[in-house]
């Protein structure tokens, strides 16, 4: 059995050693970040675009802001995508924007081919 430091069982077991106070402090920090991002996003825009798998992915995983990865084209046989991040509890607007962008880019029906 693989018992390297990077093996998922060992990584998972490390979470058992997090003291409760550190967990609570991290959750409080997450809440502050969530509130700041919520205030920032309730400005003049409904959503924003970011490269797929950018550093904001970690942020939205913590804050709960919805993120939608959409197709933006193909380079040969390699698909390209972009992430659209929306306001809290506003997934409907995010989906409508994603559909409009894919439609405008004429990529909504493009699928990569797979050799089987």
Model-derived segments and spans:
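Conserved acidic residues
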Residues: 46
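Short, gly/Ser/Thr-rich active-site loops of penicillin-recognizing serine hydrolases
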Residues: 94-116
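Short helix-loop capping/hinge segments that flank enzyme active sites or metal/cofactor-binding pockets
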Residues: 1-34, 71, 75-81
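Short hydrophobic alpha-helices that are characteristic scaffold elements of the AMP-binding
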Residues: 60-62
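A short, well-structured catalytic beta-strand-centered motif of the EAL phosphodiesterase domain
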Residues: 81-88
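Short, well-structured alpha-helical segments in soluble
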Residues: 32-43
